[in-house]
Amino acid sequence: MSFSFLEETALQYWAQLDCPTSLKLTILARAGAWAEVLTAKVAPEDFIDPEAFARANASVTFLKKNPFIPGFTDEDRGSACRTSWREGEASCYKANERLSPYIMHPLEDSMPAEFLRRARKILLGWLGPCPTDVDDGSLSYDVRPPLQGASLRRDERRRRTLADYARHGPGTTFSSSVANPTAADKYDDVLSLTRGSRFYLWNLTDSIWMRSLMARAARMSVDPLDCLNWSRGNRFTTVPKTAKTDRGIAIECTLNIYFQLAIGRAIRTGLRRNTGWDLDNAAAVHREVARKASVLGHYATIDLSNASDSLCTNLVRILLRGTPWLERMEDLRSTHTFMDGKWHRLEKFSSMGNGYTFELETCVFASLIAALLELDGRSALLGHDFFVFGDDIIVPTDTAESVVKALAWAGFRTNPEKTFLQGSFRESCGGDFFLGYPVRGFYLKQDLCYGTQAIYS
C-alpha cells in the first residue's frame, strides 16, 4: 500500500513515540483503517506514569484535527456539524420550556426559583451599569483611581458609551464583498443590519462611517435607508474543527457585530472592575490552576459540550430581566439563522460568531456556579474559589458533581472527554497536565507535500 507524504510522516512520528498506542495506530493505518485512527482515544485513568500517558496522548492527537487524511469527507464533516447545530436547538427548546414558568412567576417559592434569583443578583452585581447609547454627561464608573494629588478632568470621567467600546472584529460579515475583509473594507461595504439593530445607527452620528454612508446615498440620489442591506438575521457557515466534524458559526450583520463587540468589551470591563476577574488574562490562570489541581486534586476541570449553541433565550431573559443589558442584547442579537436555503428561528440566545457570546456565556456559567456555592454555604469568589473562562470551568472537586447537575438543569451538557472530576489529569484552556507535567499532544492541521511543493503549495 502506498502512502502520501502526510501519511508517511504520521507513521514515522508514531515510530519515534514507540508506545503501545502508537503501534496500534500504525497497524490500523497500514490496514487503511484511517477512520479508526482519527477517532482513537486514550483515557488518563488507564495510566500512572506521566511520560507513558504523554506518548499515548501524542499518538492520538497528531492527526485528530487534520482534514487531509482519508476517513471522513468534507460532506461528512459538514453533516456532523449541522446535526450538532440541530441538536443544540432541540436542547435549547427543551430548556426554554423548562424555564418558562420562572419567567411568568419569578417570585415563585421553590428551590429552582431561589437558585435563579440568587444567580441573577450575583450577575447584575458583577456587570454594573450598562453603557449608555450616547454621552449623557454622567460620571464614569470605569476609571482607575487617580494618582495621589492628581485629578481627572470631566471629559476623562464621563461614562463610556457603546460607541466608545464598539469596533470591527477580525472576521467576515453578512455583507462583506471580499473573503478576508479588513476594517477599511467593512467601512466601505454596504452596511448590513437587522431590524432590531436599526436604532443603533444613532450611535454613528457625526462619525466618518455615517458621513460615508450619507455621501453614498447622495451620489445615488436615494434615501440613506435604501442604501442599507436589511437582513432577517445571521448566516450559518462552518470552519475546521477536527478531522471528523466542522465547527458551526454564525456570520453576523456588520452593524450588529460592531455593537455586539461593544457589549462584549463592556462585560469584560464590568467583570474586571467588580470582581477582579480579567478575561484578557484568565486563560493563563486556568492553565496554572489545572496544573496544580492535577497534583493536589482539590479542583475539578469541566468542559461543556456545544456550549455556545446551548445558551437558551429564557435563561438569559431570567437572569437579565428588566435591565438595559438585556434590552441592548435583544436589539443586537439575531433571532433567525439562514442555513441550507431557509431561515430558522433560534431557540438559543446567541450563536458562536456573535460579538458578546463568549463574555455572556462566561457570566452566565459563573453566576449559576456562584449561586450554587452560596446556597451551599460556601464562599463563591470568581477567580479565587472557582474559575470560568467561556465553557472552561474549574470548581472545587467536592462540588463538581453538583455543578454538573445544576448546569444540566439549565440546559448545558458536559463534554465527558474533556471533563475531569478526579484522578491525576486535568485540562483547561489548552493546558493538559498529568501529575503536574504538561502532556498536551501536538496537532498537525495542515497537509504536507514533497520537496519544493511544500514551499509553493
Language-model segments: residues:
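Core nucleotidyl-transferase/polymerase catalytic module
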Residues: M1-F5, Y13, S212-S457
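Non-catalytic, polymerase-adjacent accessory regions of viral genome-replication enzymes
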Residues: M1-T237
